[in-house]
Amino acid sequence: MRVGVISDTHNPSVGVEPPAEIIPAFEGVDVIIHAGDIYQPSCLDWLEKIAPVYAVELGAGAHFQGDPRVVDMSRVLELEGHTIGLIHDLMVPGMAQEGTEYTPLAKHFPTGANLSSALETIFHDAVDIVIFGHTHYPVVEEFQGILMVNPGSPSLPKQIRRLGQVAVMELEPDRKSAKILDLSMFN
């Protein structure tokens, strides 16, 4: 299964629609996961022309009342035998600060910390993949057997208004991988 991963689109603040380069970047994806800061349902409508969408949004009730694609705060998805925890702002108990592309996630946890247990506190389930956003910094890292993916932002990478990134995950029952795609490769 091929999964498009996106976060922090901030539409319409940075444009009426997400960047058009997302279309070729997500070519052939079976589903799209959005890790929040969506702002408007029209963004998900636009993405849903590519593939079905699952999303989280802080305060989802404001603009997404009754929208089955979006839940507030966090959710757990089962895809291809993997349990995926989806959250916008990943602050795990014991975590020193938010993860950025410049520091391995291991540096954010105390020595001997059990990431799996900490994540179970957040998601109320054991997960083997975590998708998060908020930082606008792309991260793909496996830590303590858990694949951690932050796709960055397609429209505000590192809080700078320019073309940014998304991620694509490849899932099989016994395999998981993800890579960051720089959208400038598609224009």
Segments and roles (model prediction):
Residues 1, 67, 172-176:
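Non-catalytic terminal accessory segments
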Residues 1-4, 73-107:
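Mobile, glycine- and charge-enriched loop segments
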Residues 2-83:
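Core catalytic region of metal-dependent phosphoesterases/phosphodiesterases
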Residues 10-14, 38-44, 60-66, 92-96, ...:
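Active-site environment of divalent metal-dependent phosphoester hydrolases
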Residues 33, 83-88, 147-150:
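Short hydrophobic-aromatic micro-motifs
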Residues 53-56, 101-179:
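Conserved beta-sheet core of the metallophosphoesterase superfamily
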Residues 63-69, 87, 158-166:
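Short, charged, surface-exposed secondary-structure boundary motifs
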Residues 179-187:
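Short, solvent-exposed aromatic-acidic interface loops
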